[in-house]
Amino acid sequence: LKVKAIFNRDGGTFRTTDMDAYSRKVEEDFRAAGHEIEIAVVGANEMRDTLETACGRGDLDAIVAGGGDGTISAAAGVAWKTGMPLGIVPAGTMNLVARSLKLPLDIWKVPEVLANGRIIDADIGSADGRAFVHQFSMGLHARMVRYRQSYRFASRLGKISASTRAAIGVIFNPPDFEIEFDADGHRERRHVSAISVSNNHFGHDTLMYAEDLTSGHLGFYTAPPLSPAGVAKLSFDILRGKFRSSTLITEMSALTVDLHFPKMDRKINCVIDGELVPIRSGRVALRVHPGELKLLVGSQESNAGKTV
């Protein structure tokens, strides 16, 4: 294969990595597996343009993107729209997609796995056409992200500290809003404190990531209006890996979820793969696109695929 690797030097672990040494390691692993590879190390503000240029080239067989969860989400969106196979190097805090794909979380180990891996047809979700590889969420999560962004942090530990402060803030000020939804034709109106729509159902890990990205469904989760004690209980359930079995969570499975906010009298936000995004129209159309994202994974991945 002819591969282009694009690494976000501003993303997570890469900020403190010798990127020249790392690039040499990646090149050695891919050439040892019989592939041609080009490597670009760019800043965060150059990532999207570099990804789009690479995915538009007719001479490449795959790209590899490295960075935090935001970088991986952006790369997945570009790769999906162009049909380009994508490998990922997890350099972020959570690395949720890498966990779903059972890739090593060590940036020095994953290149060899990808170089000797195979391509699978995975699912990807979209919110009004914008790709998400992990989840779309509103309510508790969106408020926590908004609170966290109001705190300054410059390191992984700083981000964790800011997240903890934000979570405490949300416990004492939980949201409560009304939604109407249509999930594969099932229509309801509910008051909720939280909504989450995931690309495939969450597994049972504390970090709430899908254990399989090939089942072809969205996971649709809602929580009723919660008091501070209720938010604390839900947080405890999540920490125990019991989110899906929590008595506070209603779970559905769907191919399509349409959301409407009948009392949208102020600015509301959602979170798409960790990024806070404003909702302007009062409606959101969520879809799953089964098998439309081609991903480079390890050779021992249980999903059927072809060796590269």
Question: PLM features: residue spans?
Answer:
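Short, high-confidence coil segments that cap the C-terminus of an alpha-helix
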Residues: 59-60, 119, 254
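N-terminal glycine-rich "phosphate-gripper" loop used for MgATP/nucleotide binding
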Residues: 65-70
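Gly/Ser/Thr-rich active-site loops/lids in small-molecule metabolic enzymes
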Residues: 152-161, 206, 210-230
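A generic structural signal for short beta-strands and their flanking turns/coil linkers
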Residues: 175-177, 191-193, 214-219, 253-255
